Amino acid sequence: MSGMFITVEGPDGSGKSTQLQLLVENLKQKGYDIVVTREPGGTTVGNQIREVLLSPDHHEMTPRVEMMLYAASRAQNVEQVIRPALERGAIVLCDRFIDASIAYQGYGLQYDLDQIRSLNEWATNGLTPDLTFLFDLNPERASARMKDRGQLDRIESRDQAFHERVYAGFQTLLKQYPERIVRIDADQSIECIQDEVLDYTIERLQQGGVQK
């Protein structure tokens, strides 16, 4: 595959989705072939799974089922969207990927990390991002931002202890994969973050020889 696979991660409320859209716009203006997707979602099948996963009506969902639904959405996204785009040389920008499952289901719900990794290895046929931006925002600030947004989904509405475990999970991943995961201070202004993310992305694209 000759494209580049870039993911954004971070706690709910970190601003990662806003920054992803800004990065998409900036790269398109520079002439790059961009495909943008998200998880859960990104496909018709994935979007239906997303509705089930995030609906507050499904409070009885078990950690095992939650993990398997995320992996199912991810498998469809990889086969239908991500891998074909990479094979044609596009840059794929994805809002969350396997790191999110490790942080949210593994650390947040305290589900077995080895099982999560094994399931997702199979679901994606071993696909790993080339670059991941982790938007780092402490749980208290993230919680305040989420409350300002209004109604919360099933995941966002979990207690503060859950979100603190998720945050700790992301910090662990940052230490485990320093060559892939780049920490972004999400408490800066939108403009400062935008510039930092774009500069780093362009540098990595040039290093990787990705063509416009």
From Swiss-Prot:
Disulfide bonds: none annotated. It catalyses: dTMP + ATP = dTDP + ADP. Its EC number is 2.7.4.9. The keyword Kinase applies. One of its GO terms (biological process) is dUDP biosynthetic process. The keyword Nucleotide-binding applies. GO terms for molecular function: ATP binding; dTMP kinase activity. It holds the Pfam family Thymidylate_kin. One of its GO terms (cellular component) is cytosol. HAMAP family: Thymidylate_kinase (MF_00165). Belongs to the thymidylate kinase family. This is Thymidylate kinase.
